Amino acid sequence: MQELYLLGVVPSRRFEAVVNSLSKTLDGPKTILEFWVVYRPKDVPPNLPRQPDSWLRLCSNIESHDETDTEWSKNTQWSMYLEGNSEPKREDKCGIRPVNRAKLTNGSVTEFVEKMGYEFSHEYIIQGLEYFFFDTTVRIYQTLIPSQQRSIKPPFHPMNEEQPWILHVYTHVADASNQVAMAKAEANLTKVKTLLSAFCDLKNVRL
């Protein structure tokens, strides 16, 4: 599966104005509250870097979970993501990168990931809002740090005091060889970029 995307940065002082504009222009919003756990490959020789594109990420929607439940991570539905590097030399176009996603339903997620050859790296929480434009998703969010490891009990801490909001616009195409679908997806991203140009400069940032 291919993800076509654009990214932008919204200063905290402009958040409310941007959200008001998004709510008038797009369908939504839907609240985002997700817990992400990142794993890196084990046994990488010291002289070689652990490339982020080879890392594995687990995601769970924690909005409906009881924040006092210390066993939530064993009972929740996890999705697993493997994301590749975005294509180079597309500065004036949208970014494109391969994304593989699978739902994990049975057994210990941690044991499963470790048996695949990964070890824990770090974790974070994404909190924000999600909008929709045809087949395109528009997310505005902040990345937060939980107060304790694997805890969903607030407060969550921003990574810095002046942390901006990230505007992530994306769509997925199942088959990259389907040029009609790829062109349609890129056209929809261009429409969203034009719609949001008054308050955010969306760009292709290499991931």
Curated annotation (Swiss-Prot):
Gene3D superfamilies in the cross-refs: Hypothetical Protein Pfu-838710-001
Protein name: Mediator of RNA polymerase II transcription subunit 18
GO molecular function terms listed in the Swiss-Prot or TrEMBL record: transcription coactivator activity; transcription coregulator activity
GO biological process: positive regulation of transcription initiation by RNA polymerase II
Organism, scientific name: Schizosaccharomyces pombe (strain 972 / ATCC 24843)
Keywords associated with the record: Activator, Nucleus, Transcription, Transcription regulation
Function, in words: Component of the Mediator complex, a coactivator involved in the regulated transcription of nearly all RNA polymerase II-dependent genes. Mediator functions as a bridge to convey information from gene-specific regulatory proteins to the basal RNA polymerase II transcription machinery. Mediator is recruited to promoters by direct interactions with regulatory proteins and serves as a scaffold for the assembly of a functional preinitiation complex with RNA polymerase II and the general transcription factors.
Record InterPro entries: Mediator_Med18 (IPR019095)
Principal cellular location given in the protein's record: nucleus
Domain of life of the source: Eukaryota
Family: Belongs to the Mediator complex subunit 18 family.
GO cellular component, one term: core mediator complex
